[in-house]
């Protein structure tokens, strides 16, 4: 099969053009195209997503590609396949180690790493989909002392909260709200548990904004972090969730130990490529697990691989897609900085005819490559 791309080098279009990937896409277009095909099903979409993966990774966007996979996993998979988060965390950690040790081009040309990258992509694509969680609204009036006193204190004392709460370091409200939070988890009331999580986050923010301290003076966060960050209420919640899971697992037969621990670690020990929003998403998914999984018919995470032979065949095509992209020179410039500019583009006013012709020619070449991928995937 011929994987030679008809796309000409981006540098030939003109020096005043935006920075482009190795295959000739504008960076924002490459990201947009990848996100679009990631949400599509079928063999043709899988081929396109492999092409855009190879293009982004080999253009210097390896960490950006990871962020896009995390984004898809949290926004479109979630509780439908908790195993994918454990898998991605482990595989990304392994690949990050190799990426930092090896020269970039050597990493890109390694067949082993190409297959690992393709496997991550294909397994994410194969996951069942579930719409993202909707966060409940927390009205401002709920942060008044009167509302708190009238709305908490009715839940029975939680054993899990009792093992985490420290009277010498934590405000009493953490115990009262913690008991309400634990009761919500035990009742399977996901929305109510998310409400109390969000309430604690907002209460912490209000206290700091008004320079009234914080909800806790206990360092529960990772060593090496600033003291104020280590005392954030989010670490109190992860500790409570860990205790809730320990109590639930033997009672309900829940078997998600690795998945749950990986999600807790994504919040507690995030790497530099994991955004704050995704940390909160990981915490929300932990809440959803303890609320909903005990009520599943089989309280375990579904397997990621349903057809090992089909996955092996698909991963085997990775080398061809990477070879196609690596035939072009790497982009010159900071492509990750270009990617941060966002997807909004400002059309030029009255462009020159010559420039229009070059742009049209490039778009036709990109379309030709897409057709080539379509035709190839249609025969497999």
Language-model regions: role of each:
Residues 9, 13, 21-24, 44:
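Amphipathic, alpha-helical segments enriched in basic
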Residues 14, 19, 48-51, 58-380:
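C-terminal alpha-helical interaction modules of replication/initiation AAA+ assemblies
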Residues 1-16:
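Short, charge-rich, low-complexity alpha-helical interaction segments
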Residues 23, 30-37, 42-55:
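Conserved helicase/translocase motor-coupling segment
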